[in-house]
C-alpha cells in the first residue's frame, strides 16, 4: 500500500498551463499518476500533455467527475482561493507547492480543511511519491530519474527538506532498502501535514514497516513524534537525522520553519527527546542507510534487495601522466599539490584542467561549506548536470545546483 496517493487517485492540477504546472504535469503523467483534469481560468478548451483544461474546479468536476486530490502550482497570493475552491468541490487531499504563502492564508486553509475533513501537504513542498504508483509535485525531477532512484520496499520516508527527501530515498535504495511512500512535508512555518502527522499515517499503513525521517531545528514536530511514541500511538521503528546542529539561537536555518528561539526547537533538545522515546538518531547523514539496515535487521525485517550494479561505463580521468613514484593531475605534480591547495581548488582543477582564481576558489569553498549539513542531493546534482551540458561554465553549473536545494 501507500499513504495519501496511489495509482487510482484521481488528480486535478490547478495552474496547469503555467510553466511549473506544465512541466510537473508531464512528470506526473509519465510516472503513472492518474491526472484527470487541469484548471486555469480563461484557458478552458485547451489541452496540456493530453489533460483537458477547465476554467474552474467546479467545471472540471462537472465534466470529468469527482476528484480525489489537487496539485496546486500557482503564485502564492492566489493559493488560498485555489485551496478553498478545491475543498468546496469535494477534494479531500491537496498538495500546496508554492512557498511564501501568507501565514494568515494558511491558517484560514487549516480552519476550513479541519471543518471539511480535508488533508493538505505544504505549502512549500516538493511533493509526495508512492513508489511505482503515483507522484504529485516534483520529486525526482523527471519520471526517468524517479523510476531509477526509487524502488519499492517497506520503509516510509518523510522530511522537512525537499532535497534531503530525494537524497535519503536515493541513498537507502543504494543500500537495497526500498520505500512505500516518500514525502516532503513542506518548509514553511505553518504546514498541513507535519512530520508527526505523516508518521501517524505511516503507522496505519500495513506495508510500511519502518520510517526514516529528516528533521530540523525549530518548531516542535520532532518532539511531538517523541510524545506519540511514549503514548503508544507510534510503535514502528524510526530512524532520524536532524539538520542544524551548529545553528545559533535566533537564526533561520534553511527553511522558514527552521528557526531556534531561545531554548525552544534546539538540535540538542530534539535529539534528546527522540532518543529518550527510543528513536535511533544518527549524527552523520551518510550513516543513515547502514543504520537503517541494522535497525530493520534487529526487528527481524527483511528489507534489502540486490542492488543492480551498472556495467560497461567508461570513466574519464584527470590523470595526465604517470611516472615512477609520481602522478600528474592535469599537468600538475600531485605530490606538490598535496597540502598546498584546498579541496575546492582540487575539484576545480580536476574538472576544468586549470587552477581557479582566488575569487572563484573562495566561492566554491563557501558553497561546499554551506552544503555540508544537508549532504549531496540528487536533484541538485541533476540541475548542475543539465546546466553543464549546455556548455555553461563550471561556476554557473554549481550555482544551478545550489539554487535547486
Question: Can you describe what each PLM-predicted range is?
Answer:
Residues 1-308:
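Catalytic-core regions of core metabolic enzymes
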Residues 304-405:
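Hydrophobic alpha-helical bundle cores within soluble ligand-binding/oligomerization subdomains
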Amino acid at each position: 500500500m501507500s499513504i495519501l496517493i496511489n495509482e487510482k487517485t484521481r488528480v486535478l492540477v490547478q495552474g496547469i498551463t503555467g510553466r511549473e504546472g506544465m512541466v510537473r504535469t508531464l512528470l506526473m503523467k509519465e510516472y503513472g499518476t492518474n491526472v484527470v483534469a487541469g484548471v486555469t481560468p480563461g484557458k478552458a478548451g485547451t489541452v496540456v500533455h493530453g489533460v483537458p483544461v477547465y476554467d474552474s474546479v467546479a467545471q472540471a468536476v462537472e465534466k470529468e467527475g469527482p476528484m480525489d486530490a489537487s496539485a496546486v502550482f500557482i503564485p502564492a497570493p492566489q493559493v488560498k482561493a485555489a485551496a478553498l475552491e478545491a475543498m468546496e468541490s469535494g477534494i479531500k487531499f491537496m498538495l500546496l507547492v508554492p512557498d511564501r504563502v501568507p501565514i494568515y492564508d494558511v491558517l484560514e486553509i487549516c480552519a476550513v480543511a479541519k471543518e471539511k475533513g480535508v488533508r493538505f501537504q505544504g505549502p512549500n513542498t516538493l511533493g509526495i511519491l508512492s513508489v511505482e504508483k503515483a507522484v504529485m509535485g516534483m520529486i525526482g525531477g523527471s519520471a526517468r530519474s524517479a523510476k531509477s532512484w526509487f524502488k519499492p520496499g517497506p520503509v516510509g520516508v518523510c522530511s522537512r527538506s525537499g532535497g534531503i527527501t530525494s537524497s535519503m530515498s536515493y541513498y537507502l535504495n543504494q543500500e537495497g532498502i526500498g520505500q512505500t511512500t516518500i514525502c516532503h512535508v513542506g518548509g514553511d512555518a505553518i504546514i498541513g501535514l507535519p512530520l508527526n502527522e505523516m508518521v501517524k499515517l505511516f503507522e496505519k499503513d500495513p506495508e510500511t514497516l519502518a520510517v526514516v525521517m529528516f528533521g530540523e531545528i525549530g518548531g516542535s514536530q520532532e518532539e511531538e513524534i517523541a510524545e506519540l511514541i511514549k503514548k503508544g500511538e507510534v510503535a514502528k521503528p524510526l530512524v532520524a537525522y536532524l539538520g542544524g546542529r551548529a545553528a545559533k539561537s535566533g537564526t533561520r536555518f534553511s527553511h522558514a520553519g527552521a528557526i531556534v528561539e531561545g531554548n525552544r526547537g534546539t538540535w540538542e533538545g530534539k535529539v534528546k527527546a527522540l532518543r529518550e522515546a527510543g528513536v535511533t538518531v544518527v549524527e552523520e547523514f551518510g550513516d543513515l542507510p547502514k543504520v537503517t539496515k541494522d535497525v530493520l535487521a534487529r526487528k527481524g525485517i527483511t528489507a534489502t534487495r540486490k542492488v543492480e550494479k551498472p556495467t560497461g561505463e567508461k570513466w574519464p580521468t584527470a590523470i595526465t601522466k604517470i611516472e615512477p613514484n609520481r602522478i600528474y593531475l592535469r599537468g600538475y605534480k600531485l605530490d606538490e599539490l598535496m597540502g598546498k591547495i584546498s579541496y575546492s581548488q582540487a575539484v576545480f582543477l580536476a574538472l576544468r584542467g586549470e587552477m581557479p582564481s582566488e575569487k572563484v576558489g573562495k566561492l566554491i569553498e563557501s558553497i561546499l561549506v554551506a552544503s555540508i549539513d544537508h549532504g549531496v542531493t540528487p536533484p541538485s546534482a541533476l540541475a548542475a548536470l543539465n546546466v553543464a551540458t549546455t556548455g555553461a561554465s563550471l561556476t554557473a553549473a554549481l550555482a544551478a545546483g545550489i539554487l535547486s536545494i
